[in-house]
């Protein structure tokens, strides 16, 4: 969070640049974006939407990264269940 010295907009750009490299097919990047960025800016809807998109995308969207994508989906499912812990 900004109040603790972070820069959410710089983080957003970094996440977006990283996701653009694989056209969003490397799901771990999107999962981490959802988990860290949207918590930092206190955006519950963005958090829920982004993690659900990770879950809804087929893991084989990037065949060479299927295992990483499956792990991203497992994490996204867990993080969705934790939403009430992070947002009021």
Residue ranges with predicted function:
Residues 1-5, 34-43, 81-88:
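Short coil/turn linking the two alpha-helices of tandem helical-hairpin repeats
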Residues 10-12, 45-61:
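TPR/TPR-like (Sel1-like) alpha-helical repeat modules
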Residues 1-16, 23:
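Alpha-helical adaptor scaffolds
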Residues 27-32, 64-67:
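Alpha-solenoid helical repeat scaffolds
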Residues 16-20, 56, 63:
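Conserved structural position within tetratricopeptide repeats
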Residues 23-25, 60:
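Short coil loop/turn residues that delineate tetratricopeptide repeat
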Residues 60-88:
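Terminal, low-structured helical/coil segments at or just beyond the last alpha-helical repeat
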